[in-house]
Amino acid sequence: MFSLQDLCRKNTFFLPNDFSKHTLQRLGLYWKEHGSVHRIEKDSIMIQNELVLSINDALQLAGEEGDTDVVQLLLLWEGNLHYAIIGALKTENYNLVCEYHSQIQDWHILLPLIQDPETFEKCHDLSLGCDLICLLQHAVKCDMLSILVKYKEDLLNVRIRHRTQSLFVLACENRRFEIIEWIGQNLSIPEPEAIFSIAIVTKDVELFSLGYKIIFDYMQRQGIFQLTNVVRMLLLNRHIGMAIEKGLLPFILETLKYGGSVKRALSYAVIDNKRKIIDYLVRHENIPRGTIERLLHLAVKKQSSRKTLNLLLSYINYKVKNVKKLLEHVVKYNSTLVIRILLEKKKNLLDATLTRYVKDSTYFQVKEFMQDFSISPEKFIKIAVREKRNVLIKGISEDIWENPAERIRNLKQIVCTIKYESGRQFLINIIHTIYQSYSLKPEEILKLATFYVKHNATTHFKDLCKYLWLNRGTESKKLFLECLEIADEKEFPDIKSIVSEYINYLFTAGAITKEEIMQVYALEYAMY
């Protein structure tokens, strides 16, 4: 038989305003004390053409009122029966509950949908065979702290006190922080350490920190905070070891906030070859030089990896006497690896140390280091270019090469050895500032111009061209032709454009012929 309810279930539309209450009742689209009801979307209804509710909210309301007709209608519209039963339980409309009881296989499924603790408990009571512990477990899962508070005395009872541990673990696994804190303040937890293991496995720093709050608050309430300092440090050190093993830096930092030993953390990190942790702690915890040396000795003793040893070595300025002191330790533990690093890779060690000097030290400190280790100017300047320390480059190069022309010649040679473009341009900029600060001989300026062309230093080349044209005029003809040839060969269009402009000036001044231009690049300048 044709059913209007079926039609409404398949379609969304507005009811005509002229439908009477009697008509709506006959159609089954009238909700007592609310008015007309119709479906407007897949999961929404409208009451009296005004109020919009989700189907499940409407089901819960209908369940509270015990209106089985509306419940049936909303179920036709794909509502969730669980909400109707929750509503019925709230107002104790057990007739409706009994009507649909057989359709519920497991009453625990409804519990996460319930916000009211009384209704929560009523629903759980329908699960035959379940006890108080089952109720408390689901209360923890669903974050129903008020239920645990209600049964606090039962939890303190010696008969079920041992179940506190399982509730505590369950709360930790489900991140129920309020419940965890309440248990810590009100109940006795046999093994509170479980919170830290769970936090590390799940990488939950917030849970990890809460564990310390629970334990240390308990110690303070009991007046044993100072008496158990040794136990406290053992606890912190154990957690540092757990965090180091998993490589969890945020957990280590959290432990340090509660009094953990940074030296212990570094020792564990050295043994486990956790280089990122070592590097972070050394840089952010102001670790003394002596401590780093002891860590290096520990790394030798524990046969740490090459990368760990190299990292520790890079923090220290190792002059000859320091290396000899270290060798005494490595020989004692027969660490051939570190011997190979120091003897075979000494160059790399110096590079790493020099890089740190260039990055963080003053001109005088860098100069002293270069003298102590006979560091070549070229090596220093290439590192300084990488770190963008132009002041150091100018100072050291001026100190080594007093003559500006010699300084520029040596810096130009270094430019040719730098493999990355940004580094070459950085050093070329420094060369140009030297040129601007001194009066160079014409032949040096001409060499500098061709150097700029070869490295596509457009701005600096343009600056030199202006100087050459103003001061040498047509005497620069040979230079411009040479620069044109280089620019064309290397395909530097901006340089070619600049050179072409000055060749045009030369041509206009009669200082250059069409034939001379075409000898260089006939096709490019056939227009002449």
UniProtKB/Swiss-Prot annotation:
Q: Which InterPro entries match?
A: Ankyrin_rpt-contain_sf, MGF_505
Q: Name one GO cellular component term.
A: host cell cytoplasm
Signal peptide positions are none
**Subcellular localization, as worded in the UniProt entry:** Host cytoplasm
Q: Which domain of life is it from?
A: Viruses
The reply to whether Kinase figures as a keyword in the UniProt entry is no
Q: What induces it?
A: Expressed in the early phase of the viral replicative cycle.
Q: Keywords of this protein's UniProt record, alphabetized?
A: ANK repeat, Host cytoplasm, Repeat
Point out the coiled-coil segments of this chain. Answer: none
Q: Major place of localization?
A: host cell
Residue ranges of ANK repeats: 54-83, 129-158, 261-290, 292-321, 322-352
Q: Which Pfam families does its entry note?
A: DUF249
* UniProt subunit comment: Interacts with host STING1. Interacts with host JAK1; this interaction leads to JAK1 degradation. Interacts with host JAK2; this interaction leads to JAK2 degradation. Interacts with host RELA; this interaction inhibits NF-kappa-B promoter activity.
Q: In which family does this protein belong, per the annotation?
A: Belongs to the asfivirus MGF 505 family.
Q: What role does this protein play?
A: Plays a role in virus cell tropism, and may be required for efficient virus replication in macrophages. Interferes with host NF-kappa-B promoter activity mediated by TLR8. Mechanistically, inhibits the phosphorylation and subsequent nuclear translocation of host NF-kappa-B RELA subunit downstream of TLR8. Promotes the expression of the autophagy-related protein host ULK1 to degrade host STING and inhibit the interferon response. Inhibits also JAK1- and JAK2-mediated signaling and thus negatively regulates the IFN-gamma signaling.
Entry protein name: Protein MGF 505-7R
Q: Which organism is it from?
A: African swine fever virus (strain Badajoz 1971 Vero-adapted) (Ba71V)
